[in-house]
Structure formats: C-alpha cells, structure tokens
Amino acid sequence: MNVIQKVFGTHSERELKRIEPLVKRIEELRPSMQQLSDAELKAKTEEFKKRLSEGETLDDLLPEAFAVVREAGKRVLNMEHFRVQLIGGIILHQGRIAEMKTGEGKTLVSTLPAYLNALEGKGVHIVTVNDYLAKRDAEWMGEIHKFLGLTVGVVLNSMTPEERRAAYACDITYVTNNELGFDYLRDNMVIYKEQLVLRDLNYAIIDEVDSVDRKSGSTPLIISGQSGKSTKLYEICDILARQMQRGEDMEDLSKMDAIMGVEREETGDFIVNEKDKIVNLTAQGVEKVEKFFQIDNLADPENIEIQHNIILALRAHNLMFRDQDYVVKDDEVLIVDEFTGRIMPGRRYSDGLHQAIEAKEHVKVKRESKTLATITFQNFFNKFDKKAGMTGTALTEEKEFRDIYGMDVIEIPTNRPIARKDLQDAVYKTRKEKLHAIVEAVKEAHAKQQPVLVGTITIEASEELSRMLSKQGIPHKVLNAKFHELEAEIVADAGVHGAVTIATNMAGRGTDIKLDDVAREAGGLKIIGTERHESRRIDNQLRGRSGRQGDPGESKFYISLEDDLMRLFGSERLISMFNTLGIPENQEIEHKMLTNAIESAQKKIESNNFGIRKNLLEYDQVMNEQREIIYKERRQVLDGESMRDAIYKMITDITESKVDMVIGDDTDYDDWDLEELNSLLLPIIPLAPVKRGRINKPKKNALKQQLKEEAVKLYEAKEAEFPEPEAIRELERVILLKVIDRKWMDHIDDMEQLRQGAGLQAYGQRDPLVEYKMNGYEMFDEMTENIKEDTVRALLHVRVEQKVEREQVAKVTGTNKDESAVKAPVKRMDAKIYPNDPCPCGSGKKYKQCCGRKA
C-alpha cells in the first residue's frame, strides 16, 4: 500500500465512508418496519409509486425502500440482509460495480436495487451467467418481489417468443447475458412490431460482471444463417495440412524486429506462434500450396479462399486441441468454454474454423454460416440507461471497467473476517513430479477426513489425475464438460468430510459448498490448483470456493516449470538457473523469485488480453455507430411511420447524384454525356430517355429540376395505381425492411473481411484502425446509397397484383453461444437449390443465370 493510500484510504474506503449515513438510516427504520403487518408492508409498494409520480426521486425513497425489502426478506425467506449487503445494494443502485467475496450472498444483495428501480415501471434486468442460475434466482429471490406486489419473469433458452415477451414485460426479469443479447439482435431482425420481445433497455444488474466482460469480451454475439459455400475445400486443405512440416517457432522475432530488418532463417512449411495463436506460411510452404493446387500465385485475389482455408486447417491441427478446446461426441465437434470447462452445444467457431476442425476429426463438415447480426457485450450493455455489476473478483480489472464501461469498482468488506489460509505456490521441475506431489497432498488430507477440491485447466488433466487417484484407491468425483448435468449436486457435496472433487475450471459458481461439522474440525475445504491459469481472476475464484462466511479452509497451487504459463511467459533464465542448481527429483522448489515470475507472467497476459479486448472494442465502435443508425431507421419503419416523404427524398437524391456524376459544374452543354446519364438513371427510375430535344433549358440545375419533377410524377402515378393509400404505404415499409436487412447483412460480412485485411496495413506503416475507420465509413456510405437505389427501383417497378406480405430476408440457423442454440430447426421440405444447379424451371440454364437472378 503506498503512502497516499495510507493517509487518505483507498478509493473503496473513501466511498464506503460516504455511504455510511445512508446505511445508518436504513438500519434505524428496522423497528418501525417490524411493527407493520404483512398487508401494510405490501401496501408500501403502491405508496412508493405514488410518491414517485408526485415528484420524489428514487434516491429519496432509497432508505425506506431498502428497509422494506430487508423486512420482506426476513418474513418470506427468513434471510435478513446483513449490513455489508445493504452497502452492496447502494453501490449497485448508483450504477457501479460491487466486489463481494464468494459466499457473501450477492444474490440477496440484488433484490434491494432491483425492487427500488422496478418502482418506476420501466423494467429491471438481472443478468446471470447460465440458465440454471437465472431460474434458481427467479424462483428463490423472486418470492420477495412477489410478496411486495411486483411481477417477476425469467427468460430461459427453451422459451418461445410469446413467453419471452411476457417475461420481459414483468417488473423484474432474470435472464442470461446470452439470451438477452440475442433477443436484442433478433428484435432488430423482426418484420412486424408485434414480434418485438424486449422493452426499452432501462437498468441492468449484471451478476459475475467480470466473467461476462472477460469471457465474451473477445467473442461478440453472432446470429448466423447458412451461406451457399461448398464444404469440399475444407477436406482438401485438411489432406494438405497433414503433409506440411512445422518449422521452428520464431519466438523472439517480434514485429519490431521484422520492421528493423532482423532476419532469421525460416524452417519448415509453416510457423506457429502459440502466444498470439497465429499460423504463418513460410516461403517453402507457399510453394507447396501452389504446387498442390496447381496455381501460379497464392497471393492473387482469386486464391484468397485457398489461402484462408489452408491457414484454418493448420490452425485446427496445431492450435486447437481435442478434449481441451473441443470434444467430439455423436459425430459432432462441440466447443468447450475455456473459462468454465462447460460444453456449449449449438455454438460454433466462426469464419470456417469449426469446419476445419470437423475435417481434421473426420466428422461431417457442415456448411459455413453467414453472419446476420452481431454485437459485443460491451456495446450491448452500454445501451442501458443505467447498469451495475456484482462480482467476486474485479479489482484486478478495475482499469478495464473504467475504460470500457465507465464504472468504478468498490470493494465491499466481508461480513465475517476471512479465515482461509492461502499458502505459497509449490513449484516442481517437471509435470510428473508435480502430479505426484498433488496425489500425495490429496492422500494426506483424505486420511484426516478433510474435503478437497482440485481445480484443473483441461479435461485431459482432470482425467489423468482421476486415474492416478483411482490407482491409490482414493474415492472421488470428477466434474468437467463431459458430465455437467450433475454439476450442482457434485459441487454441493464437495464440502462433506472425506469428499474429493476434481473440477475443470469450474467455476460451478453460484452453488455454495457447505461444510459439515467433521469437515470444519479437519480444517475446512482444501483447495488445490494444479496449475496457474492465465488469469489471476480465475485463480482467485478457485481460492474463493473455500472459506465462505468465515469458514476455515486453505488453498495452494502446484506448478511445474513445464506448465504452459511458465513455458510461454516465464523467463528462460529462471528455468535454466534451477536446472543448473541440480535439484533432486520430487523436491519442491520454493523461491520468492518464482512467485514473482508467476505473478508477472499473469500480469503480462492480462494486459495483453486487455489490449486485445480494447482493440476489438475500438473496431466494434465503428460498427456500433453504423449499427445504431441502421437499427434506428429499421425501428422507424417498424413503428409504422409513413415512409412517403423519405421515399420522395430518395427519388430526388438519386436523380441529383446521377446528374452530378455525369455532368460537371462547368461542362459545356454540347459535352453532356446523355447516354451515360440514361444508363445510370433509367434502370432505377424508368423515365423517358433523356435526349437533347426534350431538355427544357441547357443548364445543369434546370436539368436536375426537370428530371426530379418527372421522377416525382412517375411515383405519384404509381401511388394512384393502388386502390387504398395504406396499401402502398405498407409496400414501402415491406420493401425498405427487405432492402435494409439484405444490405446490412452483406455489409457486416464486408466489414469483417475489411477488418481481417486491416492487419496487413500495419506492415505498410499505416495505422490499421485508422484505415479500417476510413474504409468502413466509405463502405457505409456506399451501402446507404445502395439501399436508396434498390428501394426506389423496386417501388417504381412493382406491379399491383396482390397484398404484399413482409418476410425475413434470411433464415436464422444458429447463434455462437451455448444457451441460445436454436433447438430442432424447422426442416425445409423441398431440396435447397444452389447457384450452379440446373434451374428447376426446365430452361436448361444454371439456376443463377435463370430464375435465381430474378430471385
């Protein structure tokens, strides 16, 4: 702690002092609340709503409202909020992040600000990390709100849009971050206002805010549909990838060295950079690919797909590992969430990586998907008028929360002092020695009936340890992605005396591990970490499973110099130093230098990851501004506003811009290229061809005026063809929605391509982000021009035959996060026609050159 903190206290301590008087007022109201009957306590809700309507603010009501919830908690659940929980509630109401240690009852804390903010009637979302917690909390904590007369809803993955709409219409809604984000994206793809499920985004309380930020900070939410690409190329590239030789890693050759011209001899066909998870072809590798595909130059634009796919195949073989990153089950590749160790059914890697892994594992390669809508969690949560977060570990990331969400983190003291002992890390030379030591430690604890929880990073490691324990005859349970149905039970039993539980990264959070008396006597829950995780937060989470509410406990991490963390980020010097010391086998190395090296490796990785997320966010910011514009326009169309004026403006804009494109301000009348003007304008607005004979005045502005008037008359004539004026208004909305959606989906794809290409700009001494922004804005302008042209073209060429129906541009086939997997999709009855198939109309042409063109 530095001098300034000693004198003035930390940021959290100063803020807690400021809140102190509020907490006192809530506590002083306790006796008067206890005297109220149930009916009188319930009547408080209506009284508060009335006071709000008469001009009081939520802050005015806070002490009394919190006191009411506190009393209701005691009556309904027999749980009265502790003082520290009241503090947490105030922090959350203020739109900040409350850091509370595991087992301090975060779930109960959220009832306070949720009740207070729900009084406005605008809705409150309590966001959890999985369906199980959302359902549990809604049923459990929901009792308090229902007792006080508020409605409580829960949104689960299996629900229909009707059920979701009803849940979101409640005063308080429990929902997972994925469901909420996807519902927002889906709401921006609906074609009738009645199909919307969400209300405006008012106030969100995000549970485990750090895990939403981390886990998904670098993977945005994606809704996808199928693209028409063939899957053969993946299988061919997989065959080639197996024949290619991996070269020596160019570990120390950084980009800086590359720019400074430091050279090292390349070896092999490709080089893998494990730190940044990148694969690059060497010159020899490029030659091999060209020879295999019989092409002259791999870098040619028409070969970009081959280049992309061979890199994917090499990544699948060298950076993606079975039973660590994914599992193969029932002829399917399923992703394993690296942070929780859970399988995520229905989620797929994007950009073709999933197909490359399918080819590697010889299972059926599914068609590639096309992104229809996407958003990052950070940008999504920033759309709420107010947001707050709860977590057990956020201070390590406080800078990030300030930078990205503009929220500060307040550390809330524990209700009882922590009695857990966190021991120094034990370091061994090799992995084998480390595992041997872990088994010995488990054996020793088991002999004295002390419960043990062993945390591993991969499924493989958990199974290996399980085999070693079985050999020693130690009964135990394993919890990893393969068995996650039993999760809650296994976690709940982990505190029984003599229990040994092995878990991958399990957070398994949300379920408390309760000790029995014998276990408490034996020293409480012993936590063993089998290696340090890249993120200190996950290490702290594992530690925090023990010692809740003042329980005894201990934690210790076992590390070997061969662990990934030490191998990739530890220093070579350190390792060689211990090698020269000649340490005997199975000897534990304890050294301050080692502990520091581990801490600094973790800090290095964290700042690296923060950089990646911040970078992603800066790129997404460009998309975000564009998304806002498109979604706002879409919403206006949905809200049933008349688009008549907008359409007329489009018609006049197009006319003006086409004249401007062909005729310069000082071009002589004789030099006007009318043929060019007709070829640009008439396909969109079918006027009579512009010839010199029918131009009223040989002035550019006069020509613009004349053509605009003709175009407007043309549209008025089209309007007159419709017997009911509302019919053409609806047609305008239908066409606009269709065009906006189709163009926006293509634009998302183009922007993704642009972003991947932006990295190459770095070598051209240009800032990739600046290039991306400039090009992105140009592409957006081009897209809006195309939307105008396509809309006007469609409206002016439409024939009045039957009532128009709105329809979705693309069918959603899936999402990229587990809980939101679309369950059984509706199968199409007729076979899908691909662009190169013969046209079903019988003309003998390819579909894309016949009916496909019209489609």
Place the predicted regions along the sequence by residue.
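Generic detector of ordered secondary-structure context
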Residues: L61, E302, Y349, T393, ...
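Active-site-adjacent structural elements in folded domains
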Residues: S110, I438, A824-V826, Y834
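A generic alpha-helix preference that emphasizes hydrophobic side chains
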Residues: I4, F66, D171, H354, ...
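Short, Lys/Glu-rich amphipathic helical modules
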Residues: K448-S462, D639-G640, R692-N696, P840
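Hydrophobic, well-ordered secondary-structure elements that form the walls
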Residues: V454, I502, W744, F780, ...
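Conserved P-loop NTPase motor core
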Residues: M1-G582, Y631-K632, D653
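Extended, charged helical/alpha-beta scaffold domains that provide interaction surfaces
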Residues: Y326-L334, T340-R347, Q549-G550, F557, ...
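A short, cysteine/histidine-rich metal-binding "knuckle" motif
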Residues: A831-D837, G842-A855
